[in-house]
Amino acid sequence: MNILFYLGHPAQYHFIKNSARQLIEDGHQVKILIKTKDILESLLQEDGWEYENIQPNYRKNAKLAILTASFKRTLAVLKAARRFKADILIGTDSSIAQAGWLLRKPAITTLEDDIEVIGNLAKLTYPFTTHIVAPRPCRVGKWEKKKVPYEGYMKLAYLHPNYFTPDENIVRDYGIEGKYVLIRLAKLVAHHDAGIGGLGTSLVKKMVAQVEAMGYKAYISSEVDLCADLEPYRLSIHYRDIHHVLAFASLLISDSQSMSVEAAMLGTPSIRFSDFKGRISVLEELEENYQLTFGIKTDEPEKLKEKTAELLRMSDVRATFQQRRQKMLSEKIDVAAFLTAFIENYPEIR
C-alpha cells in the first residue's frame, strides 16, 4: 500500500512516527509531506526520514494569506499524491481531505480538537474527508457518522510506555536537580487561539516567586520573548529532551493545551491557565475522569496560586499522580498500534 502523510506541526510528526516506521517494516511505501513549522523539519532530518516540504516559507496571518496558502497546499498534496500513486491520504490539514476527495481516494483526518474550537478548519475539512479518526470524547458536530472513535489520546502515540521511557540522567545532564516546576508559555497565534488569554509576564513573575518561596526551582519553556527579569529562568535544553524534563517536574503550569495533555500522559500534575478551560473535551476528560490536570480561566489568577500551593504541598504528589496515570493507561489503548492496524486493514477497521 502507498500511504501519504501530511504534517503541519511537530506534534503531528510525533503522532505518526511510530506507526510510519511499523508500516515500512510491514512492507508498505510511505511518503511524508510537510510545511515549515517550528522544529518539524529538524525532527525529520535528525530521525533520517525522507520528506518533501511543500510550504517552505512561513505565511502571513492575514485571512487572504491563510486561504491562499491552504489552496496552494491542496494543489501540492494533489500533485504529490498523483505522482506517488497514493492509496490513502492521512493528516490533520484540510489539504489532505480536499486532495483525497478530488482524487477519489480515502482521506483520513486525524485530530483531537473539538469542532467548536476549530470551526473554520472543520468547514474546510469535514465535508471532504472520508473518516475522522479522533479520541472518543472529541466532538465533530454533524459529521459524527464519519468519526472513528478510539479510547486514547494522540499524545499516547508517542508517550505511551511502549514507546517512551523518561530518563532522569538526561535531565541531570543539564544541571537540573532537586524539585522543580516547569512553566510553559505558548505563542497563542494559531487560528483557533484568537481571543484566548494565557499567562502574562506579571503573573509569571508572581508564580516564579511563589514556587521559589516553597522550595522549588522554576524553569520557563517559552515560545515567546521573555523580559530581562525572567530570562534567567529560561529552560535551555535540546528540544528533543523536553518530555524527559516534563516527566520529572513536580508541576507544570502552562497556557499550552498540548503540553498539558503531554504532562497527563506522563503523570506530571499540570495546571492549565487558559480561556480554553471547559472547551476541550480531551482535557476535560483527563481532569474529570483522572484528575491529572486542572483548568483555570484567566480571570481567576488567585485560584491559580491556590491550586499551585495545594499541589506543591502534597507529600505524596508523585505517587498519587502516577497511580492516576496508571488508571488512565489501563483504560486506554496503544494509539500507535491502533493507527497502524487501522491503516493496514482499511476500510475493514472503522
Descriptions of predicted regions:
Residues 129-198:
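A nucleotide-sugar donor-handling region in carbohydrate enzymes
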Residues 108-110, 118-132, 246:
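A conserved, positively charged/aromatic
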Residues 88-99, 109, 245-282:
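A donor-sugar binding/catalytic signature common to diverse glycosyltransferases
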Residues 47-60, 102, 188, 205-237:
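Catalytic donor nucleotide-activated moiety binding site of glycosyltransferases and closely related
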Residues 313-350:
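C-terminal amphipathic helix plus adjacent low-complexity
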Residues 7, 24-69:
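Conserved nucleotide-sugar phosphate-binding/catalytic loop shared by glycosyltransferases and other
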Residues 265-316:
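Catalytic binding pocket for nucleotide-activated donors in carbohydrate/polymer assembly enzymes
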Residues 73-80, 219, 223-259:
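Donor nucleotide-activated moiety binding/catalytic core segment of transferases
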